[in-house]
Amino acid sequence: MRYTSAAIEALIDAFAKLPGVGRKTARRLAMHVLQQPRLEAERLASALLDAKDLVVRCSICQNVTDRDADPCRICTGQGRDQSVICVVESPVDVLAFEKTAHYKGLYHVLHGVISPLDGIGPDDINIRELLQRLQPEEGGEVREIVLALNPTVEGETTSLYLSRLIAPLGIMVTKIARGIPVGAELEFIDEATLSRAMEGRTTF
């Protein structure tokens, strides 16, 4: 079913481009926006534009942060273990681990994984930035890299690639323990399972 209004269809199309949003959900979102006062629509539009204009990637870990808070609060936070870096695929994975309140080290966000079928190679994700952080002249001594990528074929491929790059540097490489279903995304795993996976990490 398509509406007679081109403006409504354009709004539905825009919502449907969001990850995990099908056309049925997109229609509901569009109808919800239309039923709200104009002020609410303006607030939504303003929030979207502000996020695009003001949010940047942390110059250290590549997680998202406000432009005026770079480096991010995790990289600069007191009490964080500077010797351990947990490598994740996306910012939502950082949020998942932070919700557990168990892990106290630092992070590095790749913003993707190696996927030859999609034309994504090592140079297309933040591997170079990770290796730069591991150089002695960068300051603090990193003793452990925790690979916490999603348990997919692409995630495993990326983990193997990283382990081979990092091992010659004399830094211990570990990966979170099994127990997370193959193909699952970390952002949807409950806090208890993630905590156990981090606590039970093993040498890669």
From Swiss-Prot:
User: What GO molecular functions are on record for this protein?
Assistant: DNA binding; zinc ion binding
Described by its record, this protein's role is as follows: May play a role in DNA repair. It seems to be involved in an RecBC-independent recombinational process of DNA repair. It may act with RecF and RecO.
> What is stated as this protein's family in its record?
Belongs to the RecR family.
Q: Which InterPro entries match?
A: DNA_Rcmb_RecR (IPR000093), Rcmb_RecR (IPR023627), TOPRIM_dom (IPR006171), TOPRIM_RecR (IPR034137)
Q: Could you mention a single GO BP entry for this protein?
A: DNA recombination
| Ribosomal protein found in the keyword field | no
Keyword Zinc-finger attributed: yes
> What is this protein's name?
Recombination protein RecR
Q: Which residues form the Toprim domain?
A: 83-181
Annotated C4-type zinc fingers sit at 58-75
What keywords would UniProt list here? DNA damage, DNA recombination, DNA repair, Metal-binding, Zinc, Zinc-finger
Pfam families the record matches: RecR_C, RecR_HhH, Toprim_4
